[in-house]
Amino acid sequence: MKNDTAKVRTPRRSRAIFFSLFLLAAPLAGCGYNSVIERDEEVKASWAEVENQYKRRSDLVPNLVNVVKGNANFEKSTLESVVEARSKVAGVKVDSSVIDDPAKLKQFEDAQQNLSGALSRLMVVVERYPELKATDSFRDLQAQIEGTENRITVARKRFIESVAEYNKVVQVFPSSIGASMRGKSVRPTFSAPAGLDKPPEVKF
């Protein structure tokens, strides 16, 4: 008799639990809980692409340096500034917390911009060495670096946009309630210089 009673109670208890979960899920959806999760994942995905493209550029620098060093007359100071800038980029510790830490994100961006400046100066100097520009190895690097710079621009733009959407969800009611429940707050972003939507021109 007791077993029969238990069998009757079990389905009722299951239905009660399911109904309770449904009642809990409804207000969570209403306060934008799911939107917070979605925007959070978009930020993480866009940041991963930013990291990937900057790393690709950094990986190309040693090849560029080696090709340029083949020209004995090339300005050493310009070449050394590129090597030093890349070293600083490599010295910046990047982990999952960087997208939530304004200081870390700025350190990362400053190091990358420093390398961008060093590479730009290098390319200006290369204009004085037509023999170097004419080599197959240099032309191959030209194509790779141009492509990477374009992808960096696109990745940065998407990251800035995804952070903007995330911050909107975090700050605007009622989704701000869901953000608070998940312990989420406003995230830092890259500076957006004029012409960010236009890839930098890399001339060789």
Question: Residue spans of the language-model regions?
Answer:
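A helix-centric hydrophobic-segment signal that preferentially recognizes long
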Residues: 2-204
